[in-house]
């Protein structure tokens, strides 16, 4: 993705399949959010595009920088324990933003 951004997305734009995959993923997120909004689980003003971007950012930064972060913090960023901890942080971060009542256990 980094090198594709450096080339201003010219190769990505040529791939109909990649565009279809991302469109389908966005539609799925929209459907999930709509269902949650209908049941007053998710806040009404949540943008599915922003949810996708935030999930990608929270996971992507971690993985892309795993080697330097691992050196700085003296840990394996990809050990099962580290990945589970990261997954939990991402889940809690996203749900605290999406949920009408973040203290609810409806999402578990």
UniProtKB/Swiss-Prot annotation:
Gene3D superfamilies: Tetracycline Repressor, domain 2 (1.10.357.10)
InterPro entries: NicS_C, Tet_transcr_reg_TetR-rel_C_sf
Superkingdom of the organism of origin: Bacteria
Pfam families: TetR_C_29
Protein's name according to its UniProt entry: Putative uncharacterized protein YtfA
Organism: Escherichia coli (strain K12)
